[in-house]
Amino acid sequence: GLSSTIGFQLERQYTPLVRFLPIDLIYLIALGVVVGLLAELYTRYVLTMQRQGSRWFGDRLILRMTLSGVVLGCVYAALPDTFHNPSELKHLIGAGEADIGLALSSFVMLFFCTGLAAGSGAPGGLFMPMLTLGGALGLTCGTGVESLTGYVPTTYVFAGMGAFVAGCSRTPISAMFLAFALTKDLLILKPILVASLTSFVVARLFHPHSIYERQMGMELDSEERMEKQLNRHRRPFSPPTPPQSPKGDLS
């Protein structure tokens, strides 16, 4: 199924939300606002890194990838062993077994490293980092709500996943059904939809297009600039002028 394809095995650890109280609506809207703001910040950061990488290094793709690999290697070497296994890290966050310190550090680390990897020019996807970032945000916010109020919001991890995907991709309905595919529980659709729609609206206040549409726009602009440069260096072709006969020559 989809959950096994993208690396999440959460059905056994997930406890479904039996009741949906009015207080859940308030907390989920607040989560959607926070996630929507950070999703737009993440989108702009990734696009800026891609734009700057192309501007600084141009067509020197090997140099870009080498420097990014060295920096990423140094970052991961300095991190604890928990961060060396992305699958285990995603499992800890998805199952709600990570504490707030691990969730926050995971968000910061993955936020920074994903932008750096995108700036390297190497092919790679953004979907899996979105899920992990959203889950880390949801776990952090859920733990904060529990610490401050004593109320335990059981779906914040999945609500954060769906909301972050919706904020970056501008697809709240798809994010909702993605969360359903991960959990196979219909009870999660309502809280996921609330958080995803809120994140979608907040992110659209800053820019109407998704991260993928803006990436395509950057690629088209780059191709147009390259075509203009090539046309500028080309010499215009003019056909040779035939020799003119002297005016006095009547033959």
What is each stretch, according to the model?
Residues G1-S251:
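Alpha-helical transmembrane segments and immediately membrane-proximal extracytoplasmic
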